[in-house]
Structures are given as structure tokens and as C-alpha cells.
Amino acid sequence: MIRNILKMGDERLLRIAPPVPAEMFGSSELETLIADMFETMHSVGGVGLAAPQIGIDLQLVIFGFERSERYPQAEAVPQTILLNPLITPLHPGVEEGWEGCLSVPGLRGMVDRYQSIRYEGFDPDGQPIERIAHGFHARVVQHECDHLIGRLYPSRITDFSKFGFMDVMFPDMDPNADE
């Protein structure tokens, strides 16, 4: 089922999500939620979605794609379901890159993110996940996990001359390419 995506200004996006409880791992409730999240993300061509974006207060993010219309130059990111994540930067180097968000439609901004990270957490059955990510993969993970701590990407922008409406800043780009 396609869920409604909350938009910036909805106070639910500012909450800190609690961890997914152990008793929820492997449940049909969790399976249905994840299926709904993927259906919702794919319906709008997104590359990631966090449970708080659909009003669910849980530390759950999904992400991944082979090819993205929204980010045509981005390398593929493996489809991932990540619960109760922990991100560790591998070195202090950051790089800036354009970001958009399904909860902040029509806007893009330049955001600094760690270039290389390790992320850990669990899959839906409670099995541990640990991966190293670089570049756009690392950016997507950091962006989605920000939703779990009530943070939207505009709060990370340091140069507001690089933040604006897509149809103004990128007139040749698809106006729906905002995630």
C-alpha cells in the first residue's frame, strides 16, 4: 500500500525515532511496513525512505537502486533494509553534493556529508548488517538516517546560495526529481 509522505513543517518529522523492538523482528507487521515503504518509495521514484517520513516512529530506513532518474550520474546502491542503524565515519573528510528529499518537495540544496562511512544495524529478521559505503551510497545512508534523529537536510546547508527551487536552479531537470 502506498503511504502518505509527510512534508517539512509536519512536527512528526522532527521526532527522534525509537529503536525497532526485538519482538518486532521477523513479524508480519514489520514485513507489511517494509513492503509499503518500498511501494511508496518506488511510486515516486525515490532512492531512499525512512519510516518517520510516513509517520512511523521507528528506526527503519530503506534505500537502493540500480539506476536513478533523479540522480542519473549516481552509481548503483544495493537495495537495503536497515533497522536500528549506527553510522561511523571512516575518516573526517567530507564532500559536498546536491540533495533533495521526498519530504521537502521541489527543493535541492548543497550538503556536506562524510565521504566514507561504516554502517551497522539489523535486517528485518534481526540478523546483523555491517557495510562500508563511499560516495553517493554513503550520502544516501546518512540522509536517510538523519530522518531517524528528526533532522532534514536543509538544516545541514551552510551556503544558502546553493539552496532553492529545482525549477529555478535546474530548469532543464525533471521537476519531479526532488529526492
Swiss-Prot record:
Per its UniProt record, what SUPFAM superfamilies does this chain match? Answer: Peptide deformylase
Give the EC number: 3.5.1.88
Q: Which reaction does it catalyse?
A: N-terminal N-formyl-L-methionyl-[peptide] + H2O = N-terminal L-methionyl-[peptide] + formate
EC supergroup of this enzyme: hydrolase
Q: Which GO terms describe its molecular function?
A: metal ion binding; peptide deformylase activity
The organism's place on the tree of life at top rank: Bacteria
A GO BP annotation: co-translational protein modification
- Residues engaged in binding Fe cation: 101, 143, 147
Which cofactor does the UniProt annotation name? Fe(2+)
Cite the HAMAP family for this sequence. Answer: Pep_deformylase (MF_00163)
Q: Which family does it belong to?
A: Belongs to the polypeptide deformylase family.
Give the protein's function.
Removes the formyl group from the N-terminal Met of newly synthesized proteins. Requires at least a dipeptide for an efficient rate of reaction. N-terminal L-methionine is a prerequisite for activity but the enzyme has broad specificity at other positions.
Q: What's the protein name?
A: Peptide deformylase 2
Q: Which organism is it from?
A: Pseudomonas syringae pv. tomato (strain ATCC BAA-871 / DC3000)
